Each structure stands twice: as structure tokens, then as C-alpha cells.
Amino acid sequence: DYKNITIIKDFDPSIPDLFIDSYLIENGILNLTKNAKDALLDSKTSNPIIRIVTRISHGEIIDGERNSTVCKISVIDNGPGIQEEIKDSIFFPMITGKDKGTGLGLSITQGIISQHKGNIHFSSEPNRTEFFINIPITNNKELDLKTANG
């Protein structure tokens, strides 16, 4: 339930159509926003905010390969931050900082982003956690859809 959380959508209108599996990418972003929501509600953060930001970037390096154009997606919250003891393993299956979590959401999200030849990383400190997703933009529809669908 997001009713007490301010959601700010800051979308770049210049992003071209992406040849991705939008259902999978949407699920990955939903995993990140759900984690942000849970952290905000569990910590009883006053004035809880989740920001979803999209931007275009040029010349990004993903897995050692320079990409001419990349879609950058960020999910940012003002919650308590990720516990120090799980930061190094947060993308591993069964790792969670929540009492009721399964520890699968971030692992699944990382797999989805990898299928799209992208990457995901984060920075976290008290009052700010940001997950960064980078997905290369390509004009090769057939290759991208084949990769995205396995």
C-alpha cells in the first residue's frame, strides 16, 4: 500500500522506443519500488518519498563494453538505507534485510537486467538508497528481443 508515500516520476521524454521485454523490465522496477516501500514503511520514515528517474546517457561502459546510448533508470528512496552487513551480497538469492522477505526480488531483477545486456548497482546510506539500472539502446530489434526473451 503506497498511499502514505509520495511517488515522484521524473521521466525523460527524449528516450526512444526500447526493444526490450517490457513486462520483465516492469517487474524489475516493481521489485525495486516494493523494496523501497517496505523499507520506508518499516522504518516509519517521516515524509516517505520514492523517485523513479529515467535518463539517456552516452558512452557508458557496461561489462567492459562501451555503449553509444544507454537508458538509465534510477529508483531512489529516503528510507533508512541498506544494512551494512548485506551490502556485498544483496543481489544473491535468499539475502534479505526484511523480516518477511524471500530474498529473491533483487536476484531476479539483476537477472532480468542482465538478459537485456544491462547492469544494476546501488548506493545506500541513511536517508538515501538509489538503485541504478543501465540498459543499452540498440536499433537491432531482432537481436534485442531474442536476447530479452531468452
What is each PLM-predicted segment?
Residues 105, 109:
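Short alpha-helical Gxxx[C/S/T] motif in the catalytic ATP-binding
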Residues 68-70, 82-94, 148:
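Short conserved segment of the HATPase_c
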Residues 17-20, 97:
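Conserved micro-motifs of the catalytic ATP-binding
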Residues 77:
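Acidic ATP/Mg2+-coordinating residue in the GHKL
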Residues 6-16, 55-57:
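Conserved catalytic submotifs in the C-terminal HATPase_c
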Residues 113-114:
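Detector for a conserved hydrophobic position within an alpha-helical segment of the HATPase_c
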Residues 47-60:
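Short beta-strand/loop element within the Bergerat-fold HATPase_c
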